[in-house]
């Protein structure tokens, strides 16, 4: 599956020569709405980091503390992660998010529900490759 949206910061790049963020066996945090508070995500980040998996965050907006926390965790090597803004008009964006939920087996949640997610709610795939303007999700849903 391919999404016409790319990484929100070049700090997520793992392959500088190709300007790509490559995530192996990623979990997916799919948020319908804006993700701005780091506090919302702490439990999810801890669970993913402890599992040894990577994390791809897809939301209508990822900003402020939430984006900064993801970047810091990536730079420190605590968590392999990337954030992508679900772009497009509302109907198009909602359709892309629904398709992503189907492909990955992840649960779509509102920003208020993020703190209550378990690792099992994050679905998965074999691999994700993110560039400045596109995201590819490769492989079928992989549940833990």
Which positions does each model-derived feature cover?
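Long, structured protein-protein interaction/assembly regions in large complexes
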Residues: 1-144
